[in-house]
Amino acid sequence: MISYSVMDNIKVLKKGIDISKIKAQLDQYPSDWGSQKGLDNAEIKDPHQYITSVDILQLVMGGITKKGEDVGNTEICIPTPAYEHHTEVLKYLGEQFSDIRRCGFLALPVDEIVGAHIDEGTYYLDKDRYHLSIQGQYKYIVGNEDVIVDAGTLLWFNNKMPHGTVNLGDETR
């Protein structure tokens, strides 16, 4: 892949990706948002501890073997019921990457942020993280670097550094 950036912690890999089929499937299955809640052998972070305005649609999420286990410390990956509905994003990602592990969509409302955080747990120690922007415009920040991201952009970021985002657009990103 060609990198469009000269930063160390954020690499814009592709711009101008046609995401129309991915977006169409998101629009076709609006009830998939949040559908991962309550799955057996899966863990959702405590909403009282991890307060966010982000809506989540997990396609493949982390799993656990026993109650109370930290999902960040397991290699278990569980396809959710929504997985079968979102073939276009899986097709695109499969063309770009040889192995897709945990995968989901995040919807961030206008003017909202995801504060700086580091992905916690042993799962993330040897995993790379990527974002494929589906709609809107946002600023992605990693350490002291930032980039403005538009729909149709694929980027890699260093999830071992503090990272976060702010929605700059006039629609949910």
Go through the PLM ranges and name each one.
Residues 115, 130-151:
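A short beta-strand-loop-beta hairpin characteristic of the jelly-roll/cupin
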